[in-house]
Amino acid sequence: MKKIFILIFCLISFQSTALEKKTTFSQEVFNKAQSEGKIVVVSSWIKYCSSCASQMKVLNKAKDDFQNIIYLNFDVGNEEISKLLNVQYQTTLLIFKKNKEIYRSVGETSKSKIYRAIEKSISNNLSISINSNASIGS
């Protein structure tokens, strides 16, 4: 029983650490970043989601490695933002550039795949788009 308690405590601690650097989604911040021509990475999460914590850990590292990008996230339970961004699942990762969604994935936690998507968005290669029909803040 003691081992189970310790395991649960460790898992909760890991999730808290992974989510500690999050920047909550704000329409104002999003629109300002887009108007300034910045790339915006948006991720959705939900409390007690281990894949969300894994994805957030990768994104926290990306914040250090790709500093000219705006990173935002939101709780997928926020219906207003979920509807605005057409997000139905936690760990949905979106990349926006020039007011267009240029990348979308669900459940991606691989550092190499997430970094590749960010690098392609920086290099103006918009062919990584899975759903480029979304336009926010125009």
Task: Give short role names for the model-derived ranges.
Residues 35-47:
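Short active-site neighborhood of thiol/selenol oxidoreductases, capturing the structured segment around
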Residues 46-50, 77-80, 92, 101, ...:
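Solvent-exposed loop/turn segments at secondary-structure junctions
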Residues 4-13:
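Sec-dependent N-terminal signal peptides
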Residues 51-65:
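Typically the conserved alpha-helix immediately C-terminal to a functionally engaged Cys/Sec
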Residues 44, 67-80:
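Thiol-based oxidoreductase modules, predominantly thioredoxin-like and allied folds used
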Residues 10, 17-36, 119-138:
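N-terminal leader/targeting and pre-domain segments
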Residues 85-94:
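Structural micro-motif
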Residues 97-135:
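Non-catalytic, surface beta->alpha helical segment in thiol-disulfide oxidoreductase systems
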